[in-house]
Regions:
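Amphipathic alpha-helical repeat scaffolds of TPR domains
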Residues: 6-41, 62-83, 110-131, 159-182, ...
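Intrinsically disordered, glycine/charged-rich C-terminal tails and inter-domain linkers
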Residues: 8-39, 335, 339-346, 350-354, ...
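Helix-turn-helix repeat elements of alpha-solenoid scaffolds
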Residues: 29-56, 82-102, 132-154, 182-207, ...
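Flexible helix-coil transition and linker loops at the boundaries of alpha-helical arrays
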Residues: 56-67, 100-114, 147-165, 198-217, ...
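Histidine/acidic-rich helix-loop-helix segments that form or flank divalent-metal centers
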Residues: 160-163, 210-215, 422-448, 488-534, ...
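Extended, non-transmembrane interaction/recognition domains
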Residues: 280-283, 299-314, 322-352, 385
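Acidic/His-rich, divalent-metal-binding segments that scaffold phosphate/diphosphate chemistry
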Residues: 329-478
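An active-site-proximal "capping" alpha-helix that borders the catalytic cofactor pocket
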Residues: 400-410, 476-489, 554-571
Length: 607
């Protein structure tokens, strides 16, 4: 592999270490801030070096001009970057596989085409961001198209070597990957693709032809994927799908002991739960038995186990428990109420005790699932959102800063133009606005605090400080507004917090920003969203402590940009506040002193 690729990997790992510093509680405040700032500057320098490496060796390369040695080096680099859920850099693996695929097409090298179709498809799948049941799935169609093209080479199967045959079968098995599965119609299409692929994978002809291929692993992985239909079955009584899910659950449960050690990617803690849940939907057991199984999993897990498996058993298992508790008869629910409440309290104690310097993003995902399941059960708790924010410290710092700045802008707007807030929080007159100004300011703070909660779905991109974002990654990041909206709707924020999350990147005049194709921001929250939009840009652009993907801008420079985009991107009423010298002075002091305080609070160091 080219030594420059080795340098890229070294830089990547160094930046990841610098981006996730661990501080002792007794560290001096000045030392902590200086360390974060120094790390950010170092990360920026590493990023520039990595961008130069990628431009030279990947982004600016013509596929037709690659030599055999360069192809081998690129393939080794891509394989090093991609390792499914444990990938070093999934996005760059995708770009390299794309380059290699174009080269293979030019050369007419069919084995290489199949190999790189699989590589490009599977890396794009892991790069892609997906909502619940794949309802949000920006690159799903592309992923399926690539896998289906690779699977199409089954027509020439006998002519290929064993390695290529393995990739054809992987493409075939994954051809159902990224398919939506939230409605009966979508499940029907999913099952058609699944059954076709499984029919070939279990066909004795192919197994006898190549007995050394890992047929059991292919089959096991497909059965695991079909278990995702349990989410569908919790909403629909579908005996046909339930029978298929039961079939997969039995296969997984039967083969669970076969995949350990290096094969653990195919095995996880959920197997016994999946079996019980499938039994319930197939009419073979009660909801109480599913809940009992989950309680057993939770109670046999160390409450101080903060490994990924420990987090899933202590938290994700609770979300599944919530989902099946509501399906129990009232008498069973009353009888088990103490035990289920005890588990909920236990999960909150667990969250409170997670070492903050080791806070895993797995925690964030587990809490999201818990919120979603509680929403289905009608018991969602808004307080859980704070645990999502804590999972990524830079986002937590930014959210706290934006919360304070939004409240500051709204407070000033209430003084100068209270009429703008008629309609907010049900206020029908200016006098009602004045009487509700404290509550409006607190709502503004909450909107700012949770505006980026949807980024918990895309932490893998916003934590990328070792190279520039790819266009595909930026597209995924843009969905954080919609994810945030859905998450906040689940906790009762549909009329205030959720719209703030959805619209904070939409231009004031409606002709720019994202997301696209949504109705205008509701008038009864728009004044707060307008203030939030300015506050968001202000903090992101001026953070001179931890920001490392670009250099911070001077406040005066940014004020000029606000004025230049007044009436288009930013609300005139908010930008007008920046003409007040006293307010601007207070704003600059807030940006400086408050930012330091927030960093110290988030990293748990006292001033």
């Amino acid at each position: 592999m080219d030594a420059r690729f080795e340098r890229y990997v070294e830089n990547l790992r160094t930046v990841r270490t610098l981006s996730q510093p661990k501080f002792s509680p007794d560290m001096k405040a000045k030392e902590l801030l200086e360390t974060i700032q120094s790390n950010a500057i170092k990360c920026f320098d590493y990023m520039k070096e990595n961008n130069a490496i990628l431009n030279e060796l990947v982004f600016q390369r013509a596929p037709a001009e690659l030599t055999s040695a360069e192809i081998a080096s690129l393939q080794e680099f891509a394989d090093k970057m991609f390792n499914y859920a444990s990938s070093e850099d999934c996005g760059i693996a995708y770009k390299v596989y794309s380059l290699l695929l174009e080269n293979a097409r030019i050369r007419g090298d069919k084995p290489a085409i199949v190999r790189y179709l699989y590589g490009k498809a599977v890396s794009l799948h892991y790069l892609n961001v997906r909502g619940r049941d794949y309802a949000i799935n920006p690159y799903g169609t592309q992923v399926r198209g690539l896998f289906q093209e690779g699977a199409g080479y089954i027509a020439e199967y006998e002519s290929f070597d064993k390695t290529t045959k393995g990739y054809i079968m992987r493409c075939l098995g994954n051809s159902r990957m990224s398919m939506p599965r939230s409605t009966p119609e979508e499940c029907t299409e999913y099952m058609k693709v699944f059954d076709k692929a499984m029919g070939i994978i279990t066909d004795p002809y192919y197994r006898q032809l190549d007995p050394d291929l890992p047929w059991g692993k292919f089959e096991y992985a497909m059965h695991m994927d079909r278990e995702t239909l349990l989410s569908y079955l919790r909403r629909y009584n579908d005996p046909v799908v339930a029978a298929k899910v039961m079939e997969s659950a039995e296969a997984i449960y039967r083969d669970r002991v076969l995949y350990k050690g290096e094969e653990a990617r195919l095995q996880n803690w959920r197997v016994s739960y999946l079996y019980k849940a499938a039994c319930f939907h197939a009419g073979r057991c009660t909801a109480r038995e599913v809940v009992e199984e989950l309680l057993d999993i939770i109670h046999h897990t160390d409450i101080q186990d903060y490994s990924d498996t420990g987090i899933n058993k202590n938290l994700t298992a609770v979300s599944y428990l919530v989902a099946y508790e509501v399906k129990m008869p009232p008498a069973d629910r009353r009888e088990m109420a103490c035990r289920t409440e005890e588990v909920m309290d236990r999960s909150l104690r667990y969250l409170n005790n997670v070492p903050q310097n080791q806070y895993s993003r797995v925690v964030s995902r587990a809490v999201r699932e818990l919120v979603e399941m509680q929403a289905e059960a009608g018991t969602a708790r808004r307080s859980l959102l704070n645990y999502i924010l804590v999972a990524h410290k830079p986002t937590y710092v930014h959210s706290m800063m934006v919360a304070g700045l939004t409240r500051m802008f709204v407070k000033q707007m209430l003084k100068k133009s209270p009429e703008l807030f008629v309609g907010v929080m049900g206020c029908k007159t200016v006098e009602e606005v004045r009487r509700s100004r404290i509550e409006i300011c607190e709502l503004a703070y909450e909107c700012g605090l949770y505006h980026d909660v949807g980024k918990s779905y895309v932490f893998m991109y916003i934590g990328n400080n070792y190279r520039r974002l790819l266009d595909e990654e930026f597209t995924c990041i843009q969905w954080h507004t919609v994810f945030g909206y859905e998450l906040l709707c689940n906790v009762g924020g549909k009329d205030d917090l959720a719209p703030a999350a959805l619209y904070h990147h939409t231009f004031y005049d409606g002709h720019g920003g994202y997301p696209k194709n949504y109705p205008p921001c509701p008038a009864d929250i728009k004044p707060i969203v307008d203030a939030l939009t300015v506050a968001d840009s202000l903090d992101a652009a001026t953070d001179n402590i931890g920001r490392c993907y670009t250099m911070a801008k001077p406040v005066d420079t940014l004020l000029g940009e606000f004025h230049a985009q007044r009436g288009t991107r930013y609300a005139p009423e908010v930008v007008a506040l920046l003409d007040d010298e006293d307010f601007c002075r207070d704003l600059k002091e807030t940006l400086d002193e408050t930012r330091k305080s927030v960093y110290l609070e988030v990293y748990h160091v006292k001033r």
